[in-house]
Amino acid sequence: MVVYDLLVSLSKESIDVLRFVEANLAAFNQQYIFFNIQRKNSITTPLLITPQQEKISQIVEFLMDEYNKNNRRPSGPPREQPMHPLLPYQQSSDEQPMMPYQQPPGNDDQPYEQIYHKKHASQQVNTELNDYYQHILALGDEDKGMDSMLKLPEKAKRGSDDEDDMFSIKN
């Protein structure tokens, strides 16, 4: 009866809006909540809500109340059992029981360079890169001319002292 009274008081435009709301109720829910919050806070922050918006808000509020009444779970103690009883897991005899992860033996305090390669490898690479960088800077020096372009830095020319050094440059 309340909904009927409200519908009678709505204009044709409002009924079109209501049909749109009915078709897109999920999208309208956010707007309804927005209007409802603003209506409740209108004492501190006055807001201009049109009568049409107010009536739509009342209709949606009434419909939500009816929906909640009809779809409420029956009162009583909460269900403790799931809908389908779970079967206990039975381990077959040929399956290995799961063991907790064990870290392989080794010194955890070793730095990455010692594990992957020698400790001084990255330092040597840095010095060689620095030499090449200086060589490239020297290429732009006009006093040395074309001869400086053909010469490599001294450290790059000589062979490495370590035979197992993977970063050495051999001529």
Swiss-Prot record:
Principal subcellular localization: virion
GO cellular component term of the entry, any: virion component
Biased composition annotated in UniProt, kind: Acidic residues: 161-171
Disulfide links within the chain: none
Entry's localization field: Virion
Keyword flag Plastid: no
Keywords of the record: Late protein, Virion
Similarity comment: Belongs to the asfivirus H171R family.
Protein name, per record: Uncharacterized protein H171R
Naturally occurring in which organism (per UniProt): African swine fever virus (strain Badajoz 1971 Vero-adapted) (Ba71V)
